[in-house]
């Protein structure tokens, strides 16, 4: 049966959040804020099909899918996804597949798929209490950074992020980008795409029901962050930027933002490291409680649907 995909837009938000909220899925790919703000890059489409939430998108020029969201029998949807790919002449490709979904695919069609893990897209998930307190010996270096920021910049303020902060956020993103450097075309592409995603979030801030924080020193924005829930107990931090000239700004805003979140969120997803060595080192240094591995799934006969 053909799947009624349509371009994802804001009218899909309630349906996505309702269907993901009560699952145990903590994958940042299913955060509606991410799906919406990066749609320009992936041409993301959505469908409700046989009581399952389905996503279709483009990645590096290839047609791809996310794993179905729905706990009932996947035999009602997986064959239709295979047919959808075959109908358009595309090899079947499913990205960001967690181990739970990988098991369901195998149960649905035993021996039909094979999967490869891609460490670049592993989600780093942390215990909320650890990030909110930075307590203990393992996190002492982070605690020291945050406390140093307090000592060095006594005139700092932390406040919720609002749509009125958009210009300052864009300026700080540009400052951060220059500090990181644009060493190659791939890096430049990434930064420019990220800026576009940021702009899209800020323009639709209230509709997206996003949550964020702003750190200032003497009235100057030196860091900002924002995110949105994935499910009932996991909050996804989608973006965090700081002026590296202000020592400890990253550690301080990380801690302050987590402290401000509702207590029902006991896990904090800080997303992937994309294979960037410095980013990987930074995420590991906060000692995640879970590494959510994700897989690329294809059929054993690529052109078979």
Model-derived features: positions:
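Non-cleavable N-terminal signal-anchor transmembrane helices
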Residues: 1-56, 303-305
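A residue-level signal for conserved active-site and pocket-lining positions in enzyme catalytic cores
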Residues: 16, 149, 283
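Conserved donor-binding loop and adjoining core beta-sheet/short helix segment
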Residues: 28-101, 216-244
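Short catalytic-loop micro-motif centered on adjacent basic/acidic residues
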Residues: 93-94, 159, 267-270
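Conserved active-site alpha-helix within GNAT-family acetyltransferase domains
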Residues: 101-116, 144, 274-291
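Acyltransferase donor/substrate-recognition loop-hinge adjacent to the catalytic core
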Residues: 110-188
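Short, conserved active-site entrance elements at the starts or edges of catalytic domains
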Residues: 164, 168-220
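Aromatic (often tryptophan-rich) hydrophobic motifs at membrane interfaces
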Residues: 209-300
């Amino acid at each position: 049966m053909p799947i009624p995909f349509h371009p994802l837009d804001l009218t899909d938000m309630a349906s996505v959040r309702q269907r993901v909220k009560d699952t145990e899925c903590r994958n940042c790919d299913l955060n509606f804020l991410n799906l919406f703000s990066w749609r320009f890059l992936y041409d993301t489409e959505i469908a409700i099909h046989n009581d399952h939430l389905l996503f279709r998108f483009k990645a590096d020029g290839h047609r791809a899918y996310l794993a179905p969201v729905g706990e009932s029998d996947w035999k009602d949807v997986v064959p239709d996804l295979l047919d959808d790919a075959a109908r358009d002449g595309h090899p079947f490709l499913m990205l960001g597949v967690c181990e739970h979904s990988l098991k369901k695919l195998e149960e649905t069609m035993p021996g039909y798929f094979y999967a490869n893990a891609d460490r670049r897209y592993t989600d780093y998930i942390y215990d909320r209490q650890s990030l909110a307190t930075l307590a203990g010996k393992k996190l002492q270096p982070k605690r020291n950074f945050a406390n140093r920021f307090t000592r060095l910049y006594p005139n700092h303020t932390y406040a919720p992020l609002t749509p009125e902060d958009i210009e300052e956020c864009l300026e700080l993103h540009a400052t951060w980008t220059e500090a990181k450097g644009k060493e190659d075309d791939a890096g430049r592409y990434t930064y420019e795409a990220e800026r576009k995603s940021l702009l899209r979030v800020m323009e639709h801030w209230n509709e997206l029901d996003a949550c964020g924080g702003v750190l200032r020193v003497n009235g100057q924005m030196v860091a900002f962050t924002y995110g949105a829930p994935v499910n009932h107990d996991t909050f996804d931090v989608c973006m965090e930027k700081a002026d590296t000239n202000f020592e400890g700004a990253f550690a301080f805003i990380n801690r302050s933002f987590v402290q401000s979140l509702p207590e029902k969120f006991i896990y904090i997803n800080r997303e992937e490291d994309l294979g960037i060595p410095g980013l990987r080192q930074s995420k590991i240094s906060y000692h995640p409680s879970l590494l959510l591995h994700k897989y690329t799934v294809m059929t054993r006969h690529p052109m078979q649907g």
